[in-house]
Amino acid sequence: MGSEQRKDPRVPSYAKAVFLDRQIPGYIRDLSRSGCRVSFMQPISAGVGDLITVQVIAEHDPAIAPFTVRLRVRRIVSDVLWYSLGTQIEAIVDPKEAEAFDRLVSYYSTTSGGK
């Protein structure tokens, strides 16, 4: 696999995610301040360039409140088990949700040796 070329390198992570338009469950698989990979258990109705809204639930740390994030789909990869989207963070409007997002990124950046 090639070397990481993102401005904000992604780190392995794990948090529950729900595609809000259809209540489809999934998981955040990697994360950075500018994007994430979200894997769903079934295909969702979004294509490259579309905006989606996902609720993120950090079960590992109840101090991190669930938050909602708008994501721009940049890549779609489908296999037998997962429908994965490479996404760019588009918006987190609420300051408390932005704080929860920052805490989640910091947690995984620290635990996986990221920046």
Question: What do the PLM-derived regions correspond to, one by one?
Answer:
Residues 80-115:
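C-terminal output/interaction extensions
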Residues 39-43, 88-91:
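A structural micro-motif recognizing beta-strand termini
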Residues 8, 41-46:
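Short, surface-exposed secondary-structure edge patches
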Residues 25-28, 67-76:
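Short beta-strand-centered aromatic/proline hotspots
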Residues 15-20, 49-66:
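Short conserved beta-strand and strand-loop elements enriched in small hydrophobics
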Residues 22, 33, 76-82:
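Short, conserved beta-turn/loop elements at beta-strand boundaries and strand-helix junctions
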Residues 1-36, 102-115:
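N-terminal helix initiation/capping motif
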Residues 59-61, 76-78, 92-94:
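Short coil/turn motifs at secondary-structure junctions
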